[in-house]
Amino acid sequence: MLQISNLLLVADVSAQAANNSAVGMIGSFIAAALLIVIPATAFLIFVSQNDSLERTSTGRR
C-alpha cells in the first residue's frame, strides 16, 4: 500500500481525484452487472429450464 501512495504523490494526483476515480470504477462495475450480467444470467436460466422441460416431456434424455 505504501508503494501506491508514493506513486500518487510522485504523479501529483490528489486524493480527491483518486477517490472519484475509484467511485466511478465501482459504479461502472455495478452498472455492468445490472445491464449485462443479470439479464444474461436470467436468460440462460430460462432457456435451460425450458430445454430441460421439453426434453423430459418428449421422452428424450
From Swiss-Prot:
Predominant place of localization: membrane
Gene source species: Prochlorococcus marinus (strain MIT 9215)
Function in brief: Involved in the binding and/or turnover of quinones at the Q(B) site of Photosystem II.
Entry's transmembrane regions: 26-46
Membrane association type: Single-pass membrane protein
Listed GO biological process terms: photosynthesis
Keywords per UniProt: Membrane, Photosynthesis, Photosystem II, Thylakoid, Transmembrane, Transmembrane helix
Gene, per the UniProt record: psbX
Protein name according to UniProt: Photosystem II reaction center X protein
Family recorded in the similarity comment: Belongs to the PsbX family. Type 2 subfamily.
Subunit record text: PSII consists of a core antenna complex that captures photons, and an electron transfer chain that converts photonic excitation into a charge separation. PSII forms dimeric complexes.
Keyword Nucleus: no
Localisation per UniProt entry: Cellular thylakoid membrane
Gene Ontology annotations for the cellular component aspect, listed alphabetically: photosystem II; plasma membrane-derived thylakoid membrane
